[in-house]
Amino acid sequence: MSYRELIAELAREHAEEFSDALLELGALSVSVEDADADTPDEQPLFGEPGLTPDRTAWQRSRVIALLAPEHEPAVLLTAAANEIGLPAAPSFTVREVEDQDWVRLTQSQFDPIKIGERIWVVPSWHDAPDPEALVLELDPGLAFGTGSHPTTRLCMEWLEQSVQPEQSVLDYGCGSGILAILAKKCGANPVYGIDIDPQAVESARHNSERNRAEVIYGLPDECPTGEFDIVVANILSNPLKLMASMLTSKVKPGGKIALSGILARQADEVAQVYSRWIDISVWREHEGWVCLSGTRRESH
């Protein structure tokens, strides 16, 4: 008998408690999504660097629970509703999840990705399509960034066009390390990667070793005090605005900065914050996301 997914929609105030109750009652896993994702009502949620977000669910939240074959969805749903004091169980749907070779299936979903003119991001179970290209060996993992997301792609294309040999580069919010590794392969030196998540830092170090790219990684309090020829930050618009003074202070006068993780509708607001120090504009847009790029004005 196959596994099943139980899918229910709940209001924001109940989603987290309901998810916890499902796990306590035996659900194998539970995820919460924005029920309005990919619509005009989509609500991005994020926390400031180092802080827990003040909301952990959406106005209309979709709770998805994976159930073992022996679990009856309606019974589990009713029990979870009773557990958190809901007057009635929410409506739900169920879909079958066929058991299969999950490792092979996962690998089949990640093919080599070509980015820009000569960049290939290649999972370890694939051969590089073009050995003469800039090849980054990277497996999907816990840290964000394999080149498939528009913001990562935009930053990679920008780095390919912008990095000159022996320029210093800071990747702030490095995630998997993909941008720092690419900068190194483009000839940058030295290259630093900073992230607030220790797990991301460890993942980035592992990826750099695999790619034989010498990058220095650390947490924010380990960020170098000097200035860099290039600073790149692929985070989110609100943290980027909050960190504008700090990030621009890391750019040498005449140096360049690239910012992404910004929706097209947020571009003007972010650019306005950085315009105090940087001559900045939209460099490129892709699938509703933008990369802002600019040059730090010379000191007078």
Curated annotation (Swiss-Prot):
Keywords in alphabetical order, please.
Cytoplasm, Methyltransferase, S-adenosyl-L-methionine, Transferase
What NCBIfam families does this protein's entry cite? prmA
Which GO cellular component terms are attached? cytosol
Q: Which Gene3D superfamilies match?
A: Vaccinia Virus protein VP39
EC class of this enzyme?
Answer: transferase
Query: Where in the cell?
Result: Cytoplasm
Record's protein name: Ribosomal protein L11 methyltransferase
Summarizing the function annotation, the protein's role is:
Methylates ribosomal protein L11.
Q: Which InterPro entries match?
A: Ribosomal_L11_MeTrfase_PrmA, Ribosomal_PrmA_MeTrfase, SAM-dependent_MTases_sf
Q: What is its EC number?
A: 2.1.1.-
Per the UniProt record, the source organism is Paraburkholderia phytofirmans (strain DSM 17436 / LMG 22146 / PsJN) (Burkholderia phytofirmans)
Annotated positions binding S-adenosyl-L-methionine: T152, G173, D195, N234
Protein encoded by which gene: prmA
Q: Which GO terms describe its molecular function?
A: protein-lysine N-methyltransferase activity
The signal peptide, as residue positions, is: none
Catalytic reactions of this protein? L-lysyl-[protein] + 3 S-adenosyl-L-methionine = N(6),N(6),N(6)-trimethyl-L-lysyl-[protein] + 3 S-adenosyl-L-homocysteine + 3 H(+)
Q: Which SUPFAM superfamilies match?
A: S-adenosyl-L-methionine-dependent methyltransferases
GO BP terms, alphabetized: methylation
Name the HAMAP family on file.
Methyltr_PrmA (MF_00735)
Q: Which family does it belong to?
A: Belongs to the methyltransferase superfamily. PrmA family.
